């Protein structure tokens, strides 16, 4: 499954399944955080709607993500309301439909990362749409995430520092 792309717009309509496969909610958004300048933004988790509440589901708690839905590794679910933190970006609200030059972001492709560190999802590609005055349908192109760096750039100096420290080992941060 490494290298296989899954699109955020598709993920945002999937069911949230417990460890037994029973639906407990629906995914609404994908939360990403910027990495260092050379590393792709990684998926921190998902915002789901369950029992009329918007909750956060950490990406590390998701066992599988496929057409059936996002299946959790365990049975327990944290029903505390979701509140975005400094440096986090929601793909549906903060990235999709943003203008990049004369194009608009129509979707974001995610890829499973298995590089020896903690496996997880990361942003791989961005799908851009351009409307032409003479055509009814837009033209699309798929570009690497680093060709549109302003979409995922940290918004504040504190967010940039948090992105730098996020992948470091705790003993390196303390020292």
Tell me what each language-model feature is.
Residues 1-175:
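Peripheral interaction segments used for macromolecular assembly
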């Amino acid at each position: 499954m490494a290298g296989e792309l899954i699109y955020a717009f598709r993920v945002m309509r999937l069911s949230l399944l417990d460890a037994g496969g029973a639906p407990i909610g629906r995914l609404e958004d994908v939360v990403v955080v910027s990495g260092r300048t050379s590393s792709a933004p990684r998926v921190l988790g998902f915002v789901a709607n369950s029992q009329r509440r918007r909750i956060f589901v950490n990406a590390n708690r998701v066992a599988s993500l496929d057409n059936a839905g996002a299946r959790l590794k365990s049975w327990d679910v944290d029903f505390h309301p979701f509140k975005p933190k400094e440096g986090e970006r929601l793909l549906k609200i903060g990235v999709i439909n943003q203008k990049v030059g004369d194009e608009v972001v129509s979707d974001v492709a995610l890829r499973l990362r298995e590089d020896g560190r903690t496996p997880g999802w990361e942003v791989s590609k961005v799908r851009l749409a351009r409307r032409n005055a003479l055509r009814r349908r837009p033209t699309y192109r798929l570009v690497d995430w680093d060709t549109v760096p302003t979409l995922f750039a940290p918004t504040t100096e504190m967010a940039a520092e948090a992105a730098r420290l996020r992948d470091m080992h705790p003993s390196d941060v303390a020292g």
